[in-house]
C-alpha cells in the first residue's frame, strides 16, 4: 500500500508520456508552475541573458503541480524546478536525484481550504466526515494535515479525493467534494469565479515556502549554470516585489487569469531568495517526520542528505 501511495504521489496524473531522452547539449531544462517567481523569470527573459555567456539555452516546461514536476526531474526530463515544501519530501523518499539549492520566505496566505459560499461548513472542525479535494503530495496536503490537527480532527476522519488543480476545481464547482485545499493562483481564480469562502489559510499553521531544486548530476556537472539561475532569481525577486500590478499584467495572458484577480496571488507571494539554512532544513524535517508518522512515506528520510553543498 505504501509503495502504491508513493508511486502515485509523484508519478500519477498523466506523466507517462514524459520523454526520458538525454538532455539537449548546452541546454538547461526548467520545470515551472503557474505559481512562483520562476514563471515571472520566464516571462521577463532574464535567465536567457544570464546563460548566454555560458553557452547555454533554456527550455521551459509547465507542470500543474510540484509532484508532477519532480517526477519529470526523477525520470531525467528536467534539470531544475520549483515546488512547495511537500513534493521534494515524497520525491526524496522515492529516490529522486534532487538537491535543494534555494528557497523563498514564507507565504502562508497563498494557500487555503475553500468551501462553497453557501456551504453549511463553517469551521475546519466541520470537515470531519467530509470529502476534500487536493493534489496528492503537494503543499496543501501538509497544510490540510496541520489544519485538521489544530481543529482536533484526525487525518483519517476526512475523505480525500486526490485530484490535480483543474479536476479539483471541476469537482468543487459541481459539488462532488465538500471542500478544496488549493494554492495560488488557482486559489485567487476560484475566489473570483465561484465566490468560494475561505475556511482557513496557512497563517499560523504552515510556512508555505517555495523551494528551488536541481538534479544532482546536472548540479555537479554545471554548478555555474545553477549559480546563474539563482542569481537571476535573486534579481527578478528584487524587481517584482514592489511591482505587483506590472507582474500581474504581464503574467495574466500567460496563465489565463485576469490581471485584477491575479494581482491577489502576486501580492500573497513572497520575494527574497535565500540559501538553504539550518532553520529551513529543520522545518522540512518536521514535515517529513509528520508524513512518515502518518504512514504516508515508505521510510524515514533526512533532509540534510539532499542539500547542495557550498561551491566555495
Regions found by a protein language model. Name each.
Residues 9-17:
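Bacterial N-terminal signal peptides
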Residues 43, 65, 69, 84-87, ...:
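Stable alpha-helical elements in mature extracytoplasmic
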Residues 1-9:
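Bacterial N-terminal signal peptides that target proteins for export
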Residues 86-87, 160-161, 165-253:
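Pocket-lining segment of extracytoplasmic ligand-binding domains
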Residues 220-296:
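Secondary-structure end/capping motifs
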Residues 19-25:
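Sec/Tat signal peptide C-region and signal peptidase I cleavage site
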Residues 26-153, 161-162, 178-182, 199, ...:
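Short, glycine-/small- and polar/acidic-enriched structural segments
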Residues 289-312:
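Conserved C-terminal helix/tail region of periplasmic/extracytoplasmic solute-binding proteins
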Amino acid at each position: 500500500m505504501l509503495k502504491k501511495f508513493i508511486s502515485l504521489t509523484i508519478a500519477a496524473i498523466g506523466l507517462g508520456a514524459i520523454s526520458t531522452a538525454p538532455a539537449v547539449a548546452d541546454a538547461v531544462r526548467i520545470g515551472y508552475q503557474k505559481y512562483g517567481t520562476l514563471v515571472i523569470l520566464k516571462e521577463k527573459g532574464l535567465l536567457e541573458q544570464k546563460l548566454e555567456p555560458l553557452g547555454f539555452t533554456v527550455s521551459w516546461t509547465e507542470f500543474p503541480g510540484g509532484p508532477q514536476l519532480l517526477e519529470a526531474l526523477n525520470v531525467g526530463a528536467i534539470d531544475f524546478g520549483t515546488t512547495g515544501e511537500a513534493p521534494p519530501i515524497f520525491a526524496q523518499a522515492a529516490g529522486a536525484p534532487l538537491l535543494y539549492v534555494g528557497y523563498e520566505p514564507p507565504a502562508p496566505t497563498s494557500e487555503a481550504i475553500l468551501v462553497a459560499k453557501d456551504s453549511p461548513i463553517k469551521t475546519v472542525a466541520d470537515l470531519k466526515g467530509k470529502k476534500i479535494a487536493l493534489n496528492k503530495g503537494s503543499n496543501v496536503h501538509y497544510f490540510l494535515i496541520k489544519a485538521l490537527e489544530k481543529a482536533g480532527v484526525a487525518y483519517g476522519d476526512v475523505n480525500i479525493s486526490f485530484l490535480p488543480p483543474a479536476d479539483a476545481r471541476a469537482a468543487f464547482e459541481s459539488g462532488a467534494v465538500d471542500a478544496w485545499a488549493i494554492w495560488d493562483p488557482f486559489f485567487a481564480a476560484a475566489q473570483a469565479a465561484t465566490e468560494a469562502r475561505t475556511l482557513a489559510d496557512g497563517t499560523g499553521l504552515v510556512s508555505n515556502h517555495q523551494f528551488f531544486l536541481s538534479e544532482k548530476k546536472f548540479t555537479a556537472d554545471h554548478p555555474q549554470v545553477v549559480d546563474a539561475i539563482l542569481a537571476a532569481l535573486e534579481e527578478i525577486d528584487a524587481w517584482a516585489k514592489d511591482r505587483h500590478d506590472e507582474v500581474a499584467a504581464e503574467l495574466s495572458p500567460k496563465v489565463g487569469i485576469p490581471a485584477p484577480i491575479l494581482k491577489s496571488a502576486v501580492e500573497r507571494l513572497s520575494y527574497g531568495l535565500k540559501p538553504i539554512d539550518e532553520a529551513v532544513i529543520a522545518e522540512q524535517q518536521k514535515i517529513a517526520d509528520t508524513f512518515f508518522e502518518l504512514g504516508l512515506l515508505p521510510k524515514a528520510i533526512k533532509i540534510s542528505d539532499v542539500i547542495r553543498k557550498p561551491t566555495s
